[in-house]
Amino acid sequence: MADDHKVESGLNTHVEKRAEEVHQLARQFTEQSTFSTAGQNPFAAEPGSVLDPIGNNFDALAWCKAMLHVHTEDEKAHPLRTLGIAFNNLYVHGFGSDTDYQKSVGNVWFEALALARKALGTQNQRRIQILQNLEGTVEAGEMLVVLGPPGSGCSTFLKTIAGETDGFHIDKESSINYQGVSAKKMAHEFRGEAIYAAEVDVHFPKLTVGDTLYFAARARAPRHIPGGVDVAQYASHKRDVIMAILGISHTKNTIVGNDFIRGVSGGERKRVSIAEACLSSAPLQCWDNSTRGLDSANAIEFCKALRMQADINGATVCVSLYQAPQAAYHYFDKVLVLYEGRQIFFGRTDAAKQYFLDMGFACPERQTDADFLTSMTSHIERVVQPGYEGCVPRTPDEFAARWRGSHQRARVLQDVENYNTKFTLNGEFLGKFRHSRRAQQARVQRVSSPYTLSYAQQVNLCLWRGYQRLKADPSVTISSLIGNVITALVIASIFYNLQPNTSTFFQRGALLFFACLINALGCGLEMLTLYAQRGIVEKHARYALYHPSAEAISSMIMDLPFKVLNAILSLVQALPFCAVVLLGLYSYTGFAIPTGYMLGWARWIAYINPINYGFESLLINEFHDRDFQCVAIVPSGPSYMDLHSRNQVCSTVGSVPGQAFVNGDAYIQSAYDYNVSHKWRNIGIILAFMVVLGAIYLVATDFITEKKSKGEILVFPRGHGALKSGKPDDFEGGSDRNASQEKSKSDRDDLTVIESQTAIFQWQDVCFDIKIGKESRRILDHVDGWVKPGTLTALMGVSGAGKTTLLDVLATRTTLGVISGEMLVDGKPRDESFQRKTGYAQQQDLHLSTATVREALEFSALLRQPAHVPRREKINYVTEVIKLLDMADYADAVIGVPGEGLNVEQRKRLTIGVELAARPALLLFLDEPTSGLDSQTSWAILDLLNKLRKNGQAILCTIHQPSAMLFQRFDRLLFLQAGGQTVYFGDIGQNSQILIDYFVRNGGPPCPPAANPAEWMLDVIGAAPGSHTDIDWFETWRNSPEYAQVQAHLSSLKLEHAQQNPLARVSPGTEREDRASYREFAAPFCAQLREVQIRVFQQFWRSPIYIYSKAILCVLPALFVGFSLFNTPNTIQGLQNQMFSIFLLLIQFGQLIQQIMPHFVTQRALYEVRERPSKTYSWTVFMLSNIGVELFWNSLMSILMFLCWYYPIGMYRNAEPSDTVHLRGAQMWLLIWTFLLFSSTFAHFMIAALDAAENAGNLGSFLLLLCLLFCGVLATPAQLPGFWIFMYRVSPFTYLVSGMLAVGIADTTVTCADNEYLRFDPVNDTTCGQYLAPYIAQAGGYLHDETATAACRFCPVADTNAYLRGVGASYADVWRNFGLMWVFIFTNIVAACLLYWWTRVPRVKKPVVAPQA
């Protein structure tokens, strides 16, 4: 009874406290108000009023109340919806398999066997329990904070509540009640009413913040908008409001960016994600660690905004937080504490701490409530009160058992029962909720649809966004249009003014075939674009903003003007080839393989090929009802003058003896088996194809989603001991947490491995200006400071204050903008070796995903440690770093990608470890090392940094959201405000007293005893959104005695080192003063090349999807062409078919380079963002290694391509008469080998200078078109205009086609097909042999029967060498052609390296030293 009374008393106290806080919040905003808001329309607010989100006086609370008033007064407005939740007996589980090991080219087949076993139901899957027996209620208007370390199940719980259960399963006995709505209806009919905001920020990087948020607001705009404004004004106003609340109004016209495209800062990007989710106006919101990357002030402001939503709109909010500030914790009503998936507390936030105190635990001084509750999950962090050592719980099961037996749990169960009684499933509330939702939807939208806008409105909105994206980044479209214009001019000049005679028959067919071919291949770039935006579209679908198919339609429509323009300007559109199936489309058009030569087993491909019908109609349109003058008569010459017309015939298929012309209909009927009656029928068939395929595509976009992440499961190489240990998989990545925490103290304190440092790094009057548009913006404004050995300096400031920029400038990692100021190491300017002698742990944990932890550390050690250090010593050093960082349990685990592989903490430790493995001789920079980590992990990271500090390491570290206890562990603070201006630089002091005294002395309010100084100082300078200060803290600092002391100390440091050795050149922090210590890179070139080449080969071996897709691209097209032309006969058309088999093989060039380019871009991004700035290895090593590994794999693929293409076609039989089967087979393989090597090096040549694979694809496709046009297949050298002969000679495909065709068909006879014989009568009293003897002697050819006296059957080609001469090829030139291909290959390599150096290697910018006053 006493416990019940205590709990009830605590609840009453909480209610009173919450009411008081709301009143204080209202008073705080009201004091800032200058206008009364009673009855005002927020959409018609006066400029500068408290309701104007653009003005400085904006009052968020006043706006919310005004908006609520307008909404309630409007009779047509939809009723406000609320959505609470009750869950009981909640169990969630997943399945792990035995195949969770690293896949490689060699072992990927085991995965196929496992899939087969799974399909047969014989695979044993391990059931993994994620959540166990959770219960609780969160009523409408309440806020729940979910606490627990990584791996405890926080993310899984939030996903379960939001209905996103992909990858795991909810037990059938579990109960979830959404205020009368079942979980099934919520996931389908009301998706978007309960949303899950993930920790990862996914946006269109080139879209501005304003456009990104306007789109989100517009997509959820209700049918009837209160306030008398249109939908555009409504969406714009809501966007401006949420941006003002979150403090990102200044980023409205800045692109969002991502890890590789510079845009808004990381903290601002996180707030963009928050704003986007808020604009969905979902009544149930689940936020997963959404304060990651935010400073304390903005984290508190975020929670304050959620509190306003809950209090005024009745929103239900569930949030998982790491390192939650105390002020943020107070905004929540309830707290759920999870310990390895078990619930160890659920209840009021003000009762949670007392629950554990009564259990026998103690809360250290200045520890926040949230940190105290989370510390219950770590036996190292939790503190037991004296006398309670033997009775407190220790394991997760013991904590859960204690909770199940508590009075608090009984009250929770009672609350769940009352809730379920009040809100019965599918009861009265469901009808009200559906009515409110329906009132918000467009009139034509389905009642059961989760979307607000109608389908047409969704398409229209996506069209608007597509146009904005096009404006932001038109480079791909413009390059495509320019390429098509140039291509049009080239093609027009080649086929200009075709004469109406039989000599142009092949050219007309080739031209139409080429038009169909290139337009059929126009989907390649679109596929790349669709995959790039897939994650964003799926996120918006989860928010119920629009159908994925609506985005698909809008992308089609957006492309239409450019496709129409392309059709007007040119016959073709050249884009990368992306699918092997396209080979069937352009092989079976009827031109490359005529209908009569299509084998019976493959004839059906032509029937389902829309390009076949298009080509037939185009050819009919070109030849129907036209007579073409004959230009070559057989026989002809001096011996055949004055003959009767029946004794001669036109040497063209479809000719009739005695006619001097050839009818077009007869020609296409004889040559292609085309019927003129099919012309309009084919157009109808094409339209039907368009409708059916378009419908399939739209349905697929709505139902087919990306492969879901398995969670952060540790993956080891196959055969590693960890796979056999039977440890359960961890779906959230926390399984190794306690293992790392259980290391002995002696192991943790072993710091002999870290080298002590002596160098002092100082900077003075550092400014950084960057040009944005036509204006210059100052990012850093006269920043001063120093870092000494054995000190840990914190760099803090509001998000966007320039903290990361300052680190980049100090670490010599900026390539843009203008830097001024002085940066010295022991009084001397930084030399070329500075970057490799410093460690820089970036905020983004970027690592090679296929490497293991140990390999990543060894790679850094081998290439970044001094060259004189023995290799064995470097490897041993890595082992010591692994021990130091407590990474032994996962040292051989694969890094993976974020979401799969190492968890956040492990990645952060690896990032620091990579820098430590380099043995930085000067200092260590760290950018947000605790961002996204829970309080215990953050403490462990700071513990590590303090160990490094004690051993003489100089450390400069930016940090967000430090607790008072974390903040106290730093020695000094460099504090920046917006604009990169210094607010304070100096010692922090015991209990932060020195820092506090400075601000109080200069006009700041006193710091409360229980307050966190790190949060308090942000409030003092007005850094939090909505807070203001009348004190110019930058000027205050510049006029303070502390600033004068800093300047004096900087001068003394410089003078001191100058006096020590004024003449010698000093490279501080090095052990040996030799020339090697001044080198840009620690390792010599050959060592760099060896190590990088080994790593790249390992990476490719461990990328089986990439390698096997490369194999498919080489094998399937070769097999397809080979068996489509299986054992091709040596007829005239057969020889042409064999030539086109080479042409079709060469077309795969585009597809091969398109596969390489995106892969290279990924590798280049990692190199340029992390490895190049740290001077790990040179750009030449990077380029040569990536080119070399592709050459190796393409060499292997050439063998497969050769075998799958050469022998099925039957070209080897052509070498039998000359007994050169083996020689010519080897020659053919060598030519195919050079083709693949050329493809690989050409891809690197194209992408070396360009950022986007799409732009490189456009350029590569254009050059590929030129190669195909001028290779001698579609137009022989004799048919080319004289101006274009040089293109025939510089095209590498010329020598490939010439060489491959000569090797394939030389030195054998030709046997004409029946339709290829020319039929005519000899003159009277002569045989056919006698009649044609003079002509055959002159022109060649042979007769079917020389003794015939009527109906002579003459074949104009007798041997394949004559055919080769006609197309400009000769077997004698084979070795020359092979040598020329190597010239092209080496030219590509040299050009790729030169282009990369010219366009992407940063030029060192020396800072401008400001003149001394």
From Swiss-Prot:
<dbReference type="InterPro" id="IPR043926">
    <property type="entry name" value="ABCG_dom"/>
</dbReference>
<dbReference type="InterPro" id="IPR003439">
    <property type="entry name" value="ABC_transporter-like_ATP-bd"/>
</dbReference>
<keyword id="KW-0812">Transmembrane</keyword>
<feature type="glycosylation site" description="N-linked (GlcNAc...) asparagine">
    <location>
        <position position="1324"/>
    </location>
</feature>
<feature type="domain" description="ABC transporter 1">
    <location>
        <begin position="108"/>
        <end position="365"/>
    </location>
</feature>
<feature type="transmembrane region" description="Helical">
    <location>
        <begin position="510"/>
        <end position="530"/>
    </location>
</feature>
<keyword id="KW-0547">Nucleotide-binding</keyword>
<dbReference type="InterPro" id="IPR003593">
    <property type="entry name" value="AAA+_ATPase"/>
</dbReference>
<comment type="similarity">
    <text>Belongs to the ABC transporter superfamily. ABCG family. PDR (TC 3.A.1.205) subfamily.</text>
</comment>
<feature type="glycosylation site" description="N-linked (GlcNAc...) asparagine">
    <location>
        <position position="289"/>
    </location>
</feature>
<feature type="compositionally biased region" description="Basic and acidic residues">
    <location>
        <begin position="739"/>
        <end position="748"/>
    </location>
</feature>
<dbReference type="Pfam" id="PF01061">
    <property type="entry name" value="ABC2_membrane"/>
</dbReference>
<feature type="transmembrane region" description="Helical">
    <location>
        <begin position="1290"/>
        <end position="1310"/>
    </location>
</feature>
<feature type="transmembrane region" description="Helical">
    <location>
        <begin position="1378"/>
        <end position="1398"/>
    </location>
</feature>
<keyword id="KW-0813">Transport</keyword>
<dbReference type="InterPro" id="IPR029481">
    <property type="entry name" value="ABC_trans_N"/>
</dbReference>
<feature type="transmembrane region" description="Helical">
    <location>
        <begin position="1105"/>
        <end position="1125"/>
    </location>
</feature>
<feature type="transmembrane region" description="Helical">
    <location>
        <begin position="476"/>
        <end position="496"/>
    </location>
</feature>
<feature type="glycosylation site" description="N-linked (GlcNAc...) asparagine">
    <location>
        <position position="738"/>
    </location>
</feature>
<keyword id="KW-1003">Cell membrane</keyword>
<dbReference type="Pfam" id="PF06422">
    <property type="entry name" value="PDR_CDR"/>
</dbReference>
<keyword id="KW-0677">Repeat</keyword>
<dbReference type="InterPro" id="IPR013525">
    <property type="entry name" value="ABC2_TM"/>
</dbReference>
<keyword id="KW-1133">Transmembrane helix</keyword>
<feature type="glycosylation site" description="N-linked (GlcNAc...) asparagine">
    <location>
        <position position="675"/>
    </location>
</feature>
<feature type="region of interest" description="Disordered">
    <location>
        <begin position="725"/>
        <end position="748"/>
    </location>
</feature>
<dbReference type="Pfam" id="PF19055">
    <property type="entry name" value="ABC2_membrane_7"/>
</dbReference>
<dbReference type="InterPro" id="IPR010929">
    <property type="entry name" value="PDR_CDR_ABC"/>
</dbReference>
<feature type="glycosylation site" description="N-linked (GlcNAc...) asparagine">
    <location>
        <position position="501"/>
    </location>
</feature>
<feature type="transmembrane region" description="Helical">
    <location>
        <begin position="1191"/>
        <end position="1211"/>
    </location>
</feature>
<dbReference type="Pfam" id="PF00005">
    <property type="entry name" value="ABC_tran"/>
</dbReference>
<dbReference type="InterPro" id="IPR034003">
    <property type="entry name" value="ABCG_PDR_2"/>
</dbReference>
<keyword id="KW-0472">Membrane</keyword>
<dbReference type="GO" id="GO:0016887">
    <property type="term" value="F:ATP hydrolysis activity"/>
</dbReference>
<dbReference type="GO" id="GO:0140359">
    <property type="term" value="F:ABC-type transporter activity"/>
</dbReference>
<dbReference type="Pfam" id="PF14510">
    <property type="entry name" value="ABC_trans_N"/>
</dbReference>
<feature type="transmembrane region" description="Helical">
    <location>
        <begin position="683"/>
        <end position="703"/>
    </location>
</feature>
<feature type="domain" description="ABC transporter 2">
    <location>
        <begin position="761"/>
        <end position="1003"/>
    </location>
</feature>
<feature type="transmembrane region" description="Helical">
    <location>
        <begin position="1142"/>
        <end position="1162"/>
    </location>
</feature>
<comment type="function">
    <text>ABC-type transporter; part of the gene cluster that mediates the biosynthesis of the sesterterpene variecolin. VrcC is probably involved in the secretion of variecolin.</text>
</comment>
<keyword id="KW-0067">ATP-binding</keyword>
<dbReference type="GO" id="GO:0005524">
    <property type="term" value="F:ATP binding"/>
</dbReference>
